[in-house]
UniProtKB/Swiss-Prot annotation:
Lineage of origin: Bacteria, Pseudomonadati, Pseudomonadota, Alphaproteobacteria, Caulobacterales
Cofactor(s) this protein cannot do without: Mg(2+)
Organism for this UniProt entry: Caulobacter vibrioides (strain ATCC 19089 / CIP 103742 / CB 15)
Localization terms from the record: Cell inner membrane
Residues marked Determinant of potassium independence (site): 466
Name of the protein: K(+)-insensitive pyrophosphate-energized proton pump
Binding site residues for Ca(2+): 644, 676, 680
Gene, per the UniProt record: hppA
Ranges that cross the membrane: 1-21, 56-76, 79-99, 130-150, 165-185, 231-251, 262-282, 293-313, 330-350, 393-413, 414-434, 467-487, 519-539, 588-608, 614-634
Length: 712
């Protein structure tokens, strides 16, 4: 066993240890007065009840998949890999939720003391979630790779490759359910609560008289925290696995194959250490710039990662490796890793530009709100479409540069390096729901107005960090899916060239993705429609969930007038229960769409035109999903973020181009609320859920190849 494999496992354990130590420190902080603790307890109870029901539902699907893998592969390694990926992905999300629902009330209390203490508390809780995500993912992949080698399997053998792919499938399946189910819950509560509370009743956000308030705060945790944690766990694990699979295929038969397979694990290991160091640099300076404090930690992490990645690559690849006429040298691979870090920085800046309150896109949506509801929606849609251009161009440049440096393996190394910072990026994301909840608790507990000013300042930054991390997740998902597609084409080539007589692939010949083949066009079109259909199903699900919340909140206002006067407390649990049932019910069909579609397309085309065209159509489908999925996801998340922050700009006081001041409660604000209700499911449900949808489609295609190769 290589020392680097032990170091990767050790880095995973270090991340988990960091999480445990910081959690203990966080739990020692004051949880505020009795009223604050009562509200926090209600949020905790709702979040835990929802996630338990969600994971119970997912486990039923998981058991079916495990049984299918055991039947097809007739060995323990692949089913165990799937179970490990699923359990760790679920654990990452659940742990993130457990931390955030305890940090929210402590952040509210810390914010009553100072902005610096509020920032420190919120970011610490986010860092715990981030390091647990990175730690669990690295432990899962490196640990299971160690077990497979220790049980006598060859590193480049099909058992190791198929088992690691199965691990990625387990992570992907949990991720899409968590992302979609959590998104339906949180946006059903948010949209439903806003429509009745803000628009109809004229009461502010997080007002305790709104029966959907607790459900909204529960949703922040199960959607933005648990959902994002599972999403980035899956992207981290799947990309690492895909890079290892490519290394096993590209460098099979060379002395460098073991080192190349360890390279993604080693890069992730050193970047966990740099992320932990960077977390200690998040401090509020004299300027009181919250975003600057967070970026300070991110910059330190990125700067430290550069020499760390250089060292790892030069240790594992001391001399250039020649394969099929291409040279893979340490310097070329390092520049690929550096390109991954540059792409990360560029996507972060671009996303902040399109969603930050100080820039043209958000201001233009706020200005459009002056004219009314329709113009707000038109401008928001315009920004959502425009926001796809720069991220796509950034990814294009990244692909061209890394491919010319080191081919498809160079793209894989760039994506791995990009994702190696996931620990810190998740910390930025989990910061958002904690600050949002802290503001809600401060409002409901009746804390002094200056506390709400502090939590609002943190929440405004939290909205931007959530948008930024979504941009990062989408960009990394797009590149990660490209790596998976490369693994599909290389696996297909391997099985075709090494098929035993009588096997499924024997005598099949080469598969090409030629646009003159109508079945390739069919695959492209079929793959291209999936993100749109998936987005439509998830948006419809949020609409239905919101309708049920609107009906319940209206019923409570109508049946109990004492709620509006503050004499009677609403039945918060009713809205939570309604949303829990709705989210679980609505998430099933969209989540299974990317699992069933590749299998269905393959067998339908095989029946019509044969194996070669079926594999060509399936590969083209993967390309179609990647291209349209990337644009749909970016458009939805950035556009939704612009709508959300345009509303916040107006609530803080917006001066239009004619010098007129617009504030909360006016017609301009009502128009902005309408835009926000459209943008909410855009940015927090449909858009983010497209990420795992893209990757799970590719993972299923990879597993299908392995199953067919086993003689099914």
């Amino acid at each position: 066993m290589s020392l680097w494999l032990y170091l990767a496992i050790g880095a995973g354990l270090l991340a988990v240890l960091y999480g445990a130590v910081q959690t203990a420190s966080l739990m020692r902080a004051s949880a505020g007065n009795a009223r604050m603790q009562e509200i926090a307890a209600a949020i905790q109870e709702g979040a835990q009840a929802y996630l338990k029901r969600q994971y119970t539902t997912i486990s039923i699907v998981g058991v079916v998949v495990i049984a299918a893998l055991a039947f097809f592969f007739k060995s323990w390694e692949q089913p165990v890999g799937f179970a490990l990926g699923a359990i760790l992905s679920g654990a990452a999300g659940f742990a993130g939720m457990l931390i955030s629902v305890r940090a929210n009330v402590r952040t509210a209390q810390a914010s009553s003391e100072s902005l610096a203490k509020g920032l420190s508390m919120a970011f610490t809780s986010g860092a715990v979630t981030g390091m647990l995500v990175a730690g669990f993912a690295l432990l899962g992949v490196a640990g299971y790779y160690y077990v497979l080698l220790a049980t006598g399997h060859e590193a480049t053998g099909r058992v190791v490759i198929d088992s690691l792919v199965a691990l990625g499938f387990g992570a992907s399946l949990i991720s899409i359910f968590a992302r979609l189910g959590g998104g339906i819950f949180t946006k059903g509560a948010d949209v439903g609560g806003d429509l009745v509370g803000k628009v109809e009743a004229g009461i502010p956000e997080d007002d305790p008289r709104n029966a959907a308030t607790i459900a909204d705060n529960v949703g922040d945790n199960v959607g933005d925290c648990a959902g994002m944690a599972a999403d980035l766990f899956e992207t981290y694990a799947v990309t690492t696995v895909a890079t290892m699979v490519l290394a096993a295929i590209f460098f099979r038969g060379t002395e460098a194959v073991s080192a190349m397979m360890l390279l993604p694990l080693a890069i992730c290991a050193v970047c966990i250490v740099t992320s932990i160091i960077g977390a200690f640099f998040v401090r509020l300076g004299k300027s009181q710039n919250i975003m600057g404090a967070l970026y300070q930690g991110l910059i330190v992490t990125g700067v430290l990662s550069i020499p760390a990645v250089w060292y790892v690559i030069h240790q594992l690849v001391p001399t250039a490796v020649e394969v099929d006429g291409r040279s893979y040298g340490a310097d070329a691979l390092f520049y690929c890793g550096l390109a991954g870090l540059v792409v990360t920085a560029a996507i972060v800046m671009i996303t902040e530009y399109y969603t930050g309150t100080g820039f043209r896109p958000v201001k233009s949506v706020a200005q459009a709100s002056v004219s009314g509801h329709g113009t707000n929606v038109i401008q928001g849609l315009a920004m959502s479409l425009e926001s796809t251009a720069l991220p796509a161009l950034t990814i294009i440049v990244g692909i061209v540069v890394t491919y010319n440096l080191a081919g498809l393996f160079g793209i894989a190394i760039a994506t791995t390096t990009m994702l190696s910072l996931a620990g810190f990026i998740v910390a930025l994301d989990a910061f958002g729901p904690v600050t949002d909840n802290a503001g809600g608790i401060a409002e409901m507990a009746g804390l002094p107005p200056e506390v709400r000013v502090t939590t609002d300042a943190l929440d405004a930054v939290g909205n931007t960090t959530k948008a930024v991390t979504k941009g990062y997740a989408i960009g990394s998902a797009g590149l990660g899916a490209l790596v998976l597609f490369a693994a599909y084409t290389e696996d297909l080539k391997f099985f075709s060239e090494n098929a035993a007589p009588g096997s499924f692939f024997h005598g099949m010949g080469a598969v090409t993705f030629d646009l003159s083949n109508p079945y390739v066009v069919v695959g492209l079109l079929f793959g291209g429609l999936l993100p749109f259909l998936f987005g439509g199903l998830s948006m419809t699900a949020v609409g239905r969930a919101a309708e049920s919340v609107v009906a319940e909140v209206r019923r409570q206002f109508r049946d109990n007038p004492g709620i509006m006067t503050g004499e009677v407390k609403p039945e918060y649990g009713k809205a939570v229960d309604i949303l829990t049932k709705a989210a679980i019910r609505e998430m099933i069909v969209p989540s299974l769409l990317p699992v069933v579609s590749p299998v269905a397309l393959f067998f339908v085309i095989q029946a019509i035109a044969g194996k070669v065209d079926a594999f060509a159509a399936l590969g083209a489908m993967l390309m179609g999903v990647i291209v349209t999925g990337l644009f749909v996801a970016i458009s939805m998340t950035s556009g939704g973020g612009a709508w959300d922050n345009a509303k916040k700009v107006i609530e803080e006081g917006f001066t239009d181009k004619n010098g007129v001041l617009h504030k909360k409660g006016g017609e301009t604000h009502k128009a902005a609320v309408t835009g926000d209700t459209v943008g909410d499911p855009y940015k927090d449900t449909s858009g983010p859920a497209v990420n795992p949808m893209i990757k799970i489609t590719n993972i299923v295609a990879l597993l299908l190849l392995a199953v067919l190769a086993h003689g099914v």
